[in-house]
Amino acid sequence: MQARRWMMLGLLAAAAAAQAQAPDWKKIRIGVEGAYPPFSEVDKDGRLKGFEIDLAAAYCAEMKADCTLVQQDFDGLIPALQARKVDVIIASMTITDERKRTIAFSAPYYNSPGRFIGRTDARFDVSVAGLKDKKIGVQRGTTHEKFALDTFKQSKVVSYATQDQVFLDLKSGRLDLTLADMVAVDEGFVKKPDGKGFGFVGPSFTDVKYFGVGMGVGMRKADEKTLAKKFNDAIAALRANGGFKKLNDKYFVYDVSPKN
């Protein structure tokens, strides 16, 4: 009887200790890229701005959390999360089965297919054979990179640290095409003066294996139970109160909300 009593006391103490150690998430460090307009970029004064920057602020307001933005190259965001340099990632990160083996995600907060962009005065046959030996620029660590490498094996897929670097080589003629997020490229390049003479080529790509069900807030698996609910509630609240639509309409002429 005495042994059982001590066992119960030990279990209660362990549970209390675990509860005490669980973060209350009043302070959250958010990993962002800062080089993916119009979702996330740095203005001339060195301040972060964009759709996801505003969205992150709105989520933090809903959660009543004090949030800090931490800028990081896209391919370094998951390592930064695992190294506890950030608590979550808000950086147009697609929810895929492959990524879910490493990290956890919130519900999707926006969605956009992948598309090719090339010169409007050039002709492209968007097929495996048709793009043989063509140079395709992609951002390193993205689903677009993996899709291009797996699908267009006869093409020359060139990876870059940022999408802006891809655009520079596309404009200079060192690349034939880029494969990227349709919304980001439309608003951040095609509609800008720098994108004059460029447009979408071929169909939209939505293969769930690569492009998932949308973009979600990335977090460590160990934090999923406490943190995912907070973000899911904030995502749902912004959809319900019109906050998401207000930001959507500020940046885009089309609806980027996830279709779920």
Question: Can you annotate each of these PLM segments?
Answer:
Residues Q21-S92, R101, Y254:
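Extracytoplasmic small-molecule ligand-binding "clamshell" domains
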Residues A65, M93-I95, R99, S106-Q154, ...:
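A conserved helix-loop-strand patch within extracytoplasmic ligand-binding domains
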Residues D54-E62, A122, G130, K134-K135, ...:
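Extended ligand-binding regions for polar small-molecule ligands
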Residues A65-D66, A83-A91, K135, K171-A184, ...:
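Alpha-to-beta junction loops
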Residues I53, L69-P79, R123-F124, V158-S172, ...:
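Short helix-initiation/N-cap motifs at beta->coil->alpha
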Residues S40-K44, A56-A65, V128, K132, ...:
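Ligand-binding cleft/hinge of the Venus flytrap
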Residues Y110-G118, V190-N232, Y254-N260:
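Periplasmic-binding protein-like
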Residues G76, M93-R101, D150, D176-F211:
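A ligand-binding cleft/hinge motif common to bilobed small-molecule-binding domains
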